[in-house]
Amino acid sequence: MTRPLILVTNDDGIDSVGLHVLARALTDLGDVMIVAPDQEFSGAGAAIGALHVIQPEVHLAHVEGIDRAWAVTGPPALCVMFARLGAFGRLPDLIVSGINPGANVGRSVYHSGTVGAALTGRNGHIPGIAVSQSVDDFGVEGQGYDEMLANQCWSSAATVATSAAQALLADPPPDSGVLNINVPNLPIEDMGGWRWTEVGTAPPRSMAKAELEPKLGHEGSYKVRLTWGDEQTPPSATDTGTVMEGYVSLTWLSRITALDLDTPAVETAISRLMQPAPSLTP
């Protein structure tokens, strides 16, 4: 019997510890192939880049315990797109993206490369999991800085993701959605449990202000200084609140959908624009 093929990717790059821990944890469930960016691409969302400009390349990589690993000179969504178009042979049965250091909750979901990679697979009718983990101190907009990661409980997030992956492989969802998993940075036994959640309106701590500072010796050039806002206390029903309270957050994500809004001013403006020009002949 053919073992399922699990594609593992991330937005932190091929050398990320979280990627390696996750990939090795999934090897009991099927054949694991890593296809990940060759460098840091946090915040890339579902971008694939201007392919005619970047002319991406693919290189063999070595990850201990994994038979097949590829590094792509492009963002994570491009890694997944290449895979689902057959660049690496057999198409994956499941895409697992992570482990991202820093919870991808609230509006961080929109620009998360971790989530964007899984959604790109979903566009090709391949179910996916995006797994992220909160960090000590604070992570801003879904990103954790290196100095915060010394005490990261990678194995906890990998265990949760592996359990979910096993269930999805055994009983695939009727629609190829993406399960966005956010795990507190705690040992499994210290977590409060898990909840189905809605996407919140903000991460635990947001970027609050951006100011331009002149770059010394470079007239007309500026550095951008960012100020962080205060930590928020979001509702428990949201992904943000759930993780902050020590629970695992599970949220199903799907395609971008249209809103049905009543906007007569827009309709009138576009209708006027599209009317035939008046005839100039008598």
Language model region names:
Residues 2-6, 17-86, 90-91:
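A cross-family phosphate/adenosyl-ligand binding-site feature
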Residues 8-15, 108-109:
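Short, glycine-rich nucleotide/cofactor-binding loops
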Residues 33-35, 70, 96, 127-131, ...:
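Hydrophobic/aromatic beta-strand patches that form the interior of the parallel beta-sheet core
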Residues 83-89, 116-127:
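Alpha-helix C-terminal capping segments
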Residues 103-112:
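Glycine/threonine-rich flexible loop motifs
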Residues 112-118, 142-168:
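Active-site glycine-rich loop that binds ribose-phosphate moieties when present
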Residues 122-143:
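Glycine-rich phosphate/pyrophosphate-binding loops
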Residues 150-152, 169-282:
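C-terminal accessory domains and tails appended to enzymatic cores
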